[in-house]
From Swiss-Prot:
PANTHER family: ELECTRON TRANSPORT COMPLEX PROTEIN RNFE, NA(+)-TRANSLOCATING NADH-QUINONE REDUCTASE SUBUNIT D. This is Na(+)-translocating NADH-quinone reductase subunit D. It catalyses: a ubiquinone + n Na(+)(in) + NADH + H(+) = a ubiquinol + n Na(+)(out) + NAD(+). One of its GO terms (cellular component) is plasma membrane. The gene is nqrD.
Amino acid sequence: MADKSEMKKLLLTPVLGNNPIALQVLGVCSALAVTSQMKTAFVMTLAVTAVTAFSNLFISLIRNQIPNSVRIIAQMAVIASLVIVVDQVLKAYAYEISKQLSVFVGLIITNCIVMGRAEAYAMKSAPLPSFLDGIGNGLGYGAVLLTVATVREILGSGTWFGIELLPLVNNGGWYVPNGLLLLPPSAFFIIGLIIWGVRTRDPKQVEAKD
């Protein structure tokens, strides 16, 4: 059983110290596609966190029964099943956002963060720590996603969660939205700045030269 300090470490380290996007550079593709609005980024964060946490939990529970030769297939089967459940829940209760996310919910199965934590952590750890590790990595992923979405939506649309923050010229205000920030490549630059900021703040995270 994990103690409180270990639980705290499992939850916070992926957010602050070992972020899956900022440090490990995993899960970048979805960060380009779903961060033009806060609503889609928030729902994607919840979806990835749920899949990562519960896939870690279930894989940890059956880890001793999985033959080593088929462990990847077993992990993929668990992850795919959870992705289907999440996709159907979104279609049932958040249909409009589900349409905006399109295929990207289904593509969670290919997200390196989910598969990476299942293989690197859940296959070697007890269920509760594995579940917390999944939540922590989902939150770390979401922290970057929501930061990128905040910048893109405010500067690209003048809104945040659909609420107008900057008065638009179309409505008699002063702000002219920067449409470039609504294009997927803008997320690359913002993520690059986040990575630069994180590694400048903590030089230990800079990759060693060959």
